Amino acid sequence: MIGLVGRKVGMTRVFTEEGVSIPVTVVEVEANRISQVKTLETDGYAAIQVTTGAKKANRVTKPEAGHFAKAGVEAGRGLWEFRLENGEEFEVGAELNVELFNEIKKVDVTGTSKGKGFQGAIKRWNFSTQDMTHGNSLSHRAPGSIGQCQTPGRVFKGKKMAGHMGAERVTTQNLEIVRVDAERNLLLIKGAVPGSTGGNVIVKPAVKA
């Protein structure tokens, strides 16, 4: 399914004609340049590879430089891939822009969530705290029991515990497109999207719409 790679600019709000305030996230979508077209015959699946934005020449590795030169496109800040369906055809060097979403009402947005570092079970998994008083001296924010007894004699895999939180791939589904601004290459999406300001986000038509 074809989507677009953009950059999260931040949040603002827009007003409807009735005066209702709608919170929106602004996503800047510079032209997505197609750097490679993958086919069933050569790669085993059909997809397009895109890049967007710009990258300093001294930051482009030799393999990357060769790849972009072969495609005849300017080096971008990364490479992303979208699977093709229903025999869609694209050419290397072609550009995709926000007008792709002119007829689409709902989208799924994928980004990298904000990193929170090492966090306890209360913040990380929304556990309840234990008593602050009533004889409890040291276990106010402890998770509590983590298992049973000699049987099974171990802690099950996947047990929710303290650990690294955030900085992982997150998708928020069924977000509404409020406005497509083709002149300024902006998408205004209702509500919040994953990640920090300036982070890369992938916007695709909603799969559950």
Curated annotation (Swiss-Prot):
<dbReference type="GO" id="GO:0006412">
    <property type="term" value="P:translation"/>
</dbReference>
<comment type="subunit">
    <text>Part of the 50S ribosomal subunit. Forms a cluster with proteins L14 and L19.</text>
</comment>
<dbReference type="InterPro" id="IPR019926">
    <property type="entry name" value="Ribosomal_uL3_CS"/>
</dbReference>
<keyword id="KW-0699">rRNA-binding</keyword>
<comment type="function">
    <text>One of the primary rRNA binding proteins, it binds directly near the 3'-end of the 23S rRNA, where it nucleates assembly of the 50S subunit.</text>
</comment>
<dbReference type="InterPro" id="IPR009000">
    <property type="entry name" value="Transl_B-barrel_sf"/>
</dbReference>
<keyword id="KW-0687">Ribonucleoprotein</keyword>
<feature type="modified residue" description="N5-methylglutamine">
    <location>
        <position position="150"/>
    </location>
</feature>
<dbReference type="InterPro" id="IPR000597">
    <property type="entry name" value="Ribosomal_uL3"/>
</dbReference>
<dbReference type="GO" id="GO:0019843">
    <property type="term" value="F:rRNA binding"/>
</dbReference>
<dbReference type="InterPro" id="IPR019927">
    <property type="entry name" value="Ribosomal_uL3_bac/org-type"/>
</dbReference>
<keyword id="KW-0694">RNA-binding</keyword>
<keyword id="KW-0488">Methylation</keyword>
<comment type="similarity">
    <text>Belongs to the universal ribosomal protein uL3 family.</text>
</comment>
<dbReference type="GO" id="GO:0003735">
    <property type="term" value="F:structural constituent of ribosome"/>
</dbReference>
<dbReference type="Pfam" id="PF00297">
    <property type="entry name" value="Ribosomal_L3"/>
</dbReference>
<protein>
    <recommendedName>
        <fullName>Large ribosomal subunit protein uL3</fullName>
    </recommendedName>
</protein>
<keyword id="KW-0689">Ribosomal protein</keyword>
<dbReference type="GO" id="GO:0022625">
    <property type="term" value="C:cytosolic large ribosomal subunit"/>
</dbReference>
